[in-house]
Swiss-Prot record:
Record's keyword terms, sorted: Membrane, Mitochondrion, Mitochondrion outer membrane, Transmembrane, Transmembrane helix
Lineage of producing organism: Eukaryota, Fungi, Dikarya, Ascomycota, Saccharomycotina
Primary residence: mitochondrion
GO cellular component, one term: mitochondrial inner membrane
Membrane topology, as annotated: Single-pass membrane protein
Protein name stated in the entry: Uncharacterized mitochondrial outer membrane protein YDR381C-A
Disulphide bridges, residue numbers: none
Entry's localization field: Mitochondrion outer membrane
Ranges annotated as spanning the membrane: 13-30
GO biological process: mitochondrial cytochrome c oxidase assembly; mitochondrial respirasome assembly; mitochondrial respiratory chain complex III assembly
C-alpha cells in the first residue's frame, strides 16, 4: 500500500506557484486596462479620432454628445496636440489624475503627500 501523503509537499508547491503566477498575470492585465482607460486623447491618439474605437477610451467619451464627425472637439478647433480646455467650465485635465490614492481609513496613505 502506498502512502497518500507521500507527494503532498511537492503538490502543494506546484499549486502555490501556479496560484502566485496567475495572480501576478491577472493583476498586470487589470492594471494595464485600467491605465489605458484614462489616457487623454491628445496623448493617446495624437488628435486622431477613430469612429470604431470612440467608446474604448473612457477619457474621451462625453455623455450626451454625439460621436464627433470632423475630428475637432476643442472649442477653437486648434490643430495643436496640447491639452486645451474644452470649454470655460470644463478643465483640460482628468479628475482621476488629481485624486488622492488609497482609502479614507488607511493611516499610511494619509501621511504620504501625493
Amino acid at each position: 500500500m502506498s502512502n497518500p501523503f507521500q507527494n503532498i509537499g511537492k503538490n502543494l508547491l506546484y499549486i502555490s506557484a501556479a496560484g502566485i503566477a496567475s495572480i501576478y498575470v491577472v493583476k498586470t492585465i487589470v492594471k494595464a486596462r485600467r491605465d489605458a482607460k484614462f489616457i487623454p486623447k491628445a496623448r493617446g491618439n495624437n488628435g486622431e479620432v477613430n469612429e470604431k474605437n470612440y467608446y474604448d477610451n473612457l477619457a474621451q467619451v462625453k455623455p450626451g454628445f454625439p460621436i464627433p464627425k470632423d475630428g475637432g472637439d476643442n472649442i477653437d478647433c486648434s490643430e495643436d496636440h496640447q491639452l486645451v480646455r474644452k470649454s470655460k467650465y470644463e478643465g483640460s485635465g482628468l479628475s482621476a489624475v488629481t485624486r488622492k490614492r488609497g482609502d479614507k481609513l488607511g493611516f499610511l496613505d494619509r501621511r504620504r503627500n501625493e
